[in-house]
Every structure is written in C-alpha cells, then in structure tokens.
Amino acid sequence: MTSKADYLKKYLSPASGDIEKKKKKKNKDKNKPSGLRLIEEDAFLSVDAAKTRDIGSDEEREEIEVLKQSVKKAKVVHGFKQTFAEVDAPKVIKPEPLSPDNSPPRGKRQRHDSDNSPPRPSRKRNDSDNSPPRPSRNRHDSDKDNSPPRRRRHDSDNSPPRPSRKIREESPSARNRRSPPRTRRDRHDSDNSPPRNRSRRDSDNSPPRRRPSSPARRRKDDDLSPPRKSRKIEEPKKIKKEEPDSDTETSGRTLEGKRSGLQSARDLKEESDKLRAKNSKMFEEMDTSVSGRFADTVYRQKQTKKKGKDSEEDQAKKERETKKTEELKEKYKSWNKGVAQIEDRRAQLEEMARVAAEPMARARDDDAMNAHLKEVLHAADPMANMIQKKRRDTAIDRGELVYPSYHGHFVPNRFGIAPGYRWDGVDRSNGFEGKLAKTENTKTANQSEYYKSIAEYE
C-alpha cells in the first residue's frame, strides 16, 4: 500500500486507460450485493494495511495512532454494551406533517446475517466528482429536517434493502460551517461487512482531519420529527442512590447522637457538653411518673437486705420462725437416742431418788412398798389381762392419750416393745433380733452351768 500523499496524487491525476480498465473490472466482479452503498473513496484503507505502509511524517504516525485507538474503543464499547442494558431517555413523539420528509437518509442498524467480508470500494455515481473526499453532506439551504440520523427501531421494516436516495452536491460555504466529521450510519443499500468504528456516526474510516471544531448550531426551522438520540455513544446510565449530606444524615453519627470520625478534643468536649445539657433539660421537663423522681426506694430482701432495715412484718415473721425452730429442735433432739429408753431412764432416776430419801429400816406394813408390788404385772398371773384392761379404761377416763395395742403372742425383743395393733403376725425382720437373743441366752446358760460345776467339785 502506498502512503496517503501518493494515493491523493494518483487520485487527482487525469483518468488513464489502466484506471478505466481497473474500474470496469471491479464493476464486473461486484455482483453479490443487492443494493448500492455510498462511502468515501478512502474508506477501504484498513488498519492492518496502515500498519505495513511506510510512515512518511509525524502527522501520518499520529493519524495511525488515532485509528488504533478508534478500533480499540469500538471493541470496548461493543463489550460494554453486551454487559449492561442501556436505559433510554423517555421519548416524546411530536405530530409529523403529512408532507414527505426530505431529510437526509437515516442509517440502520446492522442485521444479524450481515456479511463479514472486508470493505469494498463503492461504485461511482453519476454526479460524483474526482475531488478529495468530503465529510457527509447536509443541505445548508434546506428548510426540511436537519436532525442527525436516527437509530433503527426494533419494530422497523425488515423488507429487502432499497436503493439509496440521491444526495445533492453541497456548496463550499456549507462545508466550511460544518462541525467535526461524524461516523456515517449504515444505509438501506449497505453491504453486511464487519462493523466499523462507530465512535462518531457520520465519520468515514479515513484518518481524521485537523480542522477547528465549531460549536453545534441549531436551525431556526421547526423540526416536527420524533426526537433522535445523541450523536455520541451514550454510556449506560447507572442508577445510583443519591449520597446524602454527611453532616445532616444519621449515618455519620453514633447511637448516642454524637458525630463520628476524626475530630479535635475541643469539638468532642463541646459536643459532649451540649448533649449532657440537652439530656438534663429533657429529664427536668419529663413527668415524675415517667422519670421516677421523688419515688420511694424499694429494696429487694435477698439482695439488698441490711441490719436495722427490717420492717415490723419482717420482725414478727422472724420471731415466729425462731420459736417454731426451737420447738422442733426440742422434740427431735432425742430421736437418735430412743424416746422409750430416755423415758425409762428418767423414771429410773426418779425412783432412785425417792428410795434414797426413805429411811434405812423398812417395816412389814410399808404402804409405798405394798403399792409398788401391786402395780407390777407378772406374765403367769391369771389376773394380768383384767388388771391391764382396767388400767387402760382408767387412763381413758382421766383424758390421757391411750394408743391401741396388739393382742396376741409375738417374738420378744431386747427392748420389750410390742408390735402395732394392726400387725398380721408375719415376721418380716432379717433375724438379727433372734440371733442376738440366742447368743445372749447361750452365754447365760454357759455361765450358770460353769458356776454349778465349780460348786459340785468343791
């Protein structure tokens, strides 16, 4: 590939036979596309070809760098569009006039079945000239729609491509007032070649020209067509929460109402004083039933009980509990020693004291000795049961507590305690009392026999 200067020189030179032959050959071979596509003459210069050509000056090197950045940006924008869904601005549709629309042809989005072949040079139009490439043509003297080309809607017509409209030649004054070049959108008669750099919709693929950028102008004539999208590629709108003011939002404060973050000691002291004064004022204005002011102190007995703080009810309760404890202690203190044994021991001591008080000599008619001998009951006495029953009735008449007793024979024990009156006569003991009595009887019998033997042999 030749450089840009050589290409322009060749392009501006008069037509030759070789050029006509080459042109006819191209027209004969190009039979695949069904329509006509209008592009700039230098659009077929690809980026890959620009890498291999000879770089003549710094300006051309800068232009190549711009092309590389444009291709890289197109790839990034394509991937970015696939990642995020665009949020379009609300569309306001205005009524359109019945007259035909003479605005420039709109571009259409590329179809999914587009041709991925490399770019081809466009056919020569009847009204084309051999002048250098120009930016896209907009009529400066037209009173029709001068709005930028629109994007194709999803519900647009999917009919076969139609031949493009003819674009008239512009005047030099209109070209001088133009804004920087924009990327051209795909036309109805465009081929399905790979997508080009679409950073600017109405620009061609040639290196950008150095031209002073002029501000966008608005036409005075009213445009009744629907609103179009911006010429620049709009990035997807990210809906974010509006960040509230950190000074007025509670997120910048602690649970106590103080400000968080890095502060000086003076600010902390002032804020603490203000908060303390605010709380004191709020407590003073609060009702006594809510705040608990002037209320009597209630002490918990188990946790906060102290000496000298008992009430009258507590003192009376304490006295009752002490008295009952002494009674139970007096009643059960001898249960581990045997109640019957203690009573017998007490009666024996009283009898010993009485005998000690009697005179040394005792006569036959001693009344105390005779009464004692009458009260003693013997097992062999036939009158023993009658006397025992008489004594029982006498005790009941005196109002004494008399328990019923068992009437019948039972195995004797070392304490001489009779079984209860409800006993059924079955011995349920472990035999300890019987063994103990047998051992005691054997010992007594052996002693008696030993004593008799000694008396006989002496």
Swiss-Prot record:
UniProt protein name: BUD13 homolog
UniProt feature, compositional bias: Basic residues: 175-185, 208-218
Upper classification of the organism: Eukaryota, Metazoa, Ecdysozoa, Nematoda, Chromadorea
Gene that this polypeptide is encoded by: bud-13
Keyword Coiled coil annotated: yes
Keywords: Coiled coil
Biological processes, Gene Ontology terms: mRNA splicing, via spliceosome
Positions with biased composition (Basic and acidic residues): 138-148, 219-243, 266-284, 314-328
Organism in which the protein naturally occurs: Caenorhabditis elegans
Coiled-coil ranges from the UniProt annotation: 262-356
Source domain of life: Eukaryota
GO cellular component assignments: U2-type spliceosomal complex
Stretches for region Disordered: 16-37, 81-328, 437-458
Pfam family, one: Bud13
Family the entry assigns: Belongs to the CWC26 family.
